Amino acid sequence: SEVKMDAEFRHDSGYEVHHQKLVFFAEDVGSNKGAIIGLMVGGVVIATVIVITLVML
C-alpha cells in the first residue's frame, strides 16, 4: 500500500513539474514576442532551404 501511494505521489509531482514547465513556457513566449517572430522566420528559412533542395534534385 505504501509503495503504491509513493508511486502515485511521484506521478503527480512529475505531472506538476511538467505543468509548471508548460505554464512557464507560455508566459515566456507571451512576454517575448520577438522569440515567436524569430521562430517564424527560422521556420520560413528552413522551409525555403527544403524547397530549394527538392527543386535541385
Swiss-Prot record:
GO terms for molecular function: metal ion binding; signaling receptor activator activity; signaling receptor binding. It comes from Ursus maritimus (Polar bear). Residues 1-33 are extracellular. Keywords: Amyloid, Cell membrane, Cell projection, Coated pit, Copper, Cytoplasm, Cytoplasmic vesicle, Endosome, Membrane, Metal-binding, Nucleus, Secreted, Transmembrane, Transmembrane helix, Zinc. It is found in: Cell membrane; Membrane; Perikaryon; Cell projection, Growth cone. Binds, via its C-terminus, to the PID domain of several cytoplasmic proteins, including APBB family members, the APBA family, MAPK8IP1, SHC1 and NUMB and DAB1. Binding to DAB1 inhibits its serine phosphorylation. Interacts (via NPXY motif) with DAB2 (via PID domain); the interaction is impaired by tyrosine phosphorylation of the NPXY motif. Also interacts with GPCR-like protein BPP, APPBP1, IB1, KNS2 (via its TPR domains), APPBP2 (via BaSS) and DDB1. In vitro, it binds MAPT via the MT-binding domains. Associates with microtubules in the presence of ATP and in a kinesin-dependent manner. This is Amyloid-beta precursor protein. CDD domains: JMTM_APP. The record marks 12-13 as: Cleavage.
